[in-house]
Amino acid sequence: MSLDAKTVTRIARLARIGLQPEEIETLGKDMGSIIDWVEQLKEVDVTGVDPMIGTGLAKPRLREDRVTDGNCRDKVLSNAPEREGPFYTVPKVVE
């Protein structure tokens, strides 16, 4: 299956993806093959198979929570449009 140029362009616009005209045909074929694959999955007999949202076997590795200053204050402050010492300077919004 291959999607027509109008459909590909519409999907790209909805996804906010900029496409060059020469990409439309290739992308249409790629999207079509994905749709064909999903159609094949619909044909699989899953009778008697319980729905599953995860294996439940894997335990996530957690790191120890430690509060740090990041050790990069000067690097962060270098992005400030204005600063006074080690602080950002922002316009006054409340009088």
UniProtKB/Swiss-Prot annotation:
The keyword ATP-binding applies. Its EC number is 6.3.5.-. It holds the Pfam family GatC. GO terms for biological process: glutaminyl-tRNAGln biosynthesis via transamidation; regulation of translational fidelity; translation. PANTHER family: GLUTAMYL-TRNA(GLN) AMIDOTRANSFERASE SUBUNIT C, MITOCHONDRIAL. It catalyses: L-glutamyl-tRNA(Gln) + L-glutamine + ATP + H2O = L-glutaminyl-tRNA(Gln) + L-glutamate + ADP + phosphate + H(+); L-aspartyl-tRNA(Asn) + L-glutamine + ATP + H2O = L-asparaginyl-tRNA(Asn) + L-glutamate + ADP + phosphate + 2 H(+). Allows the formation of correctly charged Asn-tRNA(Asn) or Gln-tRNA(Gln) through the transamidation of misacylated Asp-tRNA(Asn) or Glu-tRNA(Gln) in organisms which lack either or both of asparaginyl-tRNA or glutaminyl-tRNA synthetases. The reaction takes place in the presence of glutamine and ATP through an activated phospho-Asp-tRNA(Asn) or phospho-Glu-tRNA(Gln). Gene3D superfamilies: Glu-tRNAGln amidotransferase C subunit, N-terminal domain. InterPro entries: Asp/Glu-ADT_sf_sub_c, GatC. Belongs to the GatC family. Heterotrimer of A, B and C subunits. It comes from Gluconobacter oxydans (strain 621H). This is Aspartyl/glutamyl-tRNA(Asn/Gln) amidotransferase subunit C. The gene is gatC. Signal peptide: none annotated. One of its GO terms (molecular function) is asparaginyl-tRNA synthase (glutamine-hydrolyzing) activity. It is an enzyme of class 6 (ligase). Keywords: ATP-binding, Ligase, Nucleotide-binding, Protein biosynthesis.
